[in-house]
């Protein structure tokens, strides 16, 4: 602590080309020795004595957004001017809170306005705007500019499929159903295969198929375009049944068939033998190493 130099107030600090970088107001320049601070049990950097006088928060002028206050919230300012002086003096203590709130609202509206204007600028550059758009009679052009963005968002939502039930099924103008499918209130869903009983193929007459008797009436009624067809008796005496294709063997049957086939003819499943010609000749003797002590320097790794 003894090696520290006395603190120099910023007002008396040397100001000139030889002086160091000027410190902000309230910061004191001191020559600090870290070796002394390590031996000293006291805190390394004690807080300055004039802690309360240091301006920590930035100073914001009160009426910075005065012109914005007039343009954005004209009605609110007019109503506040119309207040009697007695109430104004009573509410003087609440003035800072009201100012902060108004500033917050103004900043929000400013940000919104800038965002909308940048969106419109981009739309104009990209050619996304309708050229023949005219604003509504009761609205000013400024308001319709911002309404246009919400309108475009709504169109985007409709395109992405977020339609309501009323939009999906529009109510029919006609109260009674007509023959045309477009104007009828209930639209039939069209598929590949007809599902109604009226559109299904008519069942064959059992008497035309079987003139002998009416025992097969139930089986003939069950006959349809899809599903298993029962046996139909014909005059020629042959039984007519739907061909469903050859029965597919189960994998166990396939494995059994392969095993029996391999047992019957084992030569089929043997891999072909490769005939490698052996070159007959004298085998070369293994080479002996003729190493001399000086050659060991080359073979030794560098770490040794």
From Swiss-Prot:
Primary role: Potential NADPH-dependent oxidoreductase. May be involved in the regulation of neuronal survival, differentiation and axonal outgrowth.
UniProt similarity note: Belongs to the P33MONOX family.
Biased composition (Low complexity): 171-186
Keywords, alphabetical: Cytoplasm, NADP, Oxidoreductase, Phosphoprotein
Subunit structure, interactors included: Interacts with NELFB, NOL12 and PRNP.
Residue numbers spanned by region Disordered: 1-22, 38-57, 69-96, 159-231, 262-304
E.C. no: 1.-.-.-
Residue positions, PTM Phosphothreonine: 45
PTM annotation (Phosphoserine): residues: 183-184
Claim: NADP is one of the keywords in the record: yes
Enzyme class per UniProt: oxidoreductase
Composition-biased stretches (Polar residues): 77-90
Record's subcellular location: Cytoplasm
Recorded GO CC terms: cytoplasm
Residue interval(s) of motif Flavin-containing monooxygenase motif: 68-78
Cystine bridges: none
Major localization listed first in the record, in broad terms: cytoplasm
Gene Ontology terms, MF aspect: oxidoreductase activity
Tagged with keyword Endoplasmic reticulum: no
Name assigned to this protein: Putative monooxygenase p33MONOX
Cited InterPro entries: P33MONOX
Species the sequence originates in: Rattus norvegicus
